[in-house]
Amino acid sequence: IIDNQLAILGKNISNTYDKLENEKEDSKALVTDISHQLKTPLASLSMCNSILEDDELTLDEKHEFLAMSNKNISKLQNLIECLVNISRLEAAMIKLKPVKSSLKDTVIKAYNSAYIKAQNKNIDIILEILKDYQIVHDNKWTEEAIFNVIDNGIKYTELGGKIIITMEESLNFIKINIEDNGSGIDKKEFNNIFKRFYRGKEHEKKGIEGSGVGLYLTRKIFEDQGGSILVKSKIGSGSKFTLMLPK
């Protein structure tokens, strides 16, 4: 009996050690990623400020570099907000508060948050008739997660494009489909786009702004609620993201 108890105790200690080592590696990776993400906008901001010290600059040139500085400050603010959310989620400091409520209302709030940005690119966001499913979910964070996918669609859809949002019911899940007619995603990148700080080839090619955290946060928020996110896409034919939450 004592031998069995010692064996169990030894196994528990080993598992705890492995868990702590994994958490340590995750923390180191997060710090490295954060440092890398902050480096570019900080370098740009530093460069603009150095140039602004030049007394020979014209007023127009000063306005131009001030505008660039403000743009980089805005980027940093958005990035820091995303980084705070990621670190809090990964450290389990954010406690999701699921309650039984209308998923339709949550989707509409996410739609409203993205509406002006879509209008600025003349992109139609079409909300097809949504059934009012009452399911257990965290309203605030689920709205944030849905917004991230819509916002991603806006970034990769050309002027005058279209995004369609639908909802459907399967045996165990309620599905939210967000489909765009944008540039599409290479099949090889399907797994990578949900990784922390990953920015796809189209992102770099077209110079699309973004931190590479939106889809990662969405995946984390949905998985923490027993759900998931899937993507179907083809280069040049747009993308369809399906977000699922248990009924």
Residue ranges and their predicted role:
Residues 153-154:
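Short helix-loop "hinge" at the ATP-lid/N-box region of the Bergerat-fold HATPase_c
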